[in-house]
Amino acid sequence: MSASKNEKIIKASVIPLIFPILLWIIHLTAQFIGLDLYKMGLLPRNTTGLLGIVTAPLIHGDFSHLISNTFPLIILGWIILFFYPKVSYFLFIFIYLVTGLLVWIFARQVYHIGASGIVYGFVSFLFFSGLFRKDNTSITLALIITFLYGGIVWGMLPGMKGISWESHLLGAVTGLVAAYLFRKVDPPAKKYDWEDGPDDFNVDDLEVSYDPEKNKFDI
């Protein structure tokens, strides 16, 4: 394995940990000092709630809420950073902010908290990238994502108490838009037959198509 490939794997394994670690630091600190952060959540169509576009994904109701988002963020973050490195950082910012803005515009007027909108955005991006890009890698990733996270589609339906289904739905919509906008970024490298490896023959051993003995003509 080349040094660049090792570096890519290490980078993809470390960077996706940063955001979940930040979430845990915030939650543990709030628990330790008895601070209730829910009012820093996103309150739709309220000017004071605009701050929640940035702060809401950082806040979680309890440990189960936080844990349910932690592992998908790490796994999906690794996949995106490894297979779509050029778009990965901007994708995170795009899904983070656009999902929040859409929730602020369209969602119910209750406090919305948690990073699940980002999770849904990541899942949607990976799934629809397979449809838009149509290369083998993207299609394979889309199938894997469908197998691992296909059941989360139920989280986009209204009716479940204590669930911001709007964040889930609008995160998925944002991921779909991102998959289309970035469909030509990080294309798979084209490989030709002659790139498979060095020639396994010696040019001196090649047969010559011209044989002077067989090409004599009687005059």
Protein language model features and the residues they cover:
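A detector for small-residue-rich transmembrane helices and their helix-helix packing motifs
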Residues: 1-219
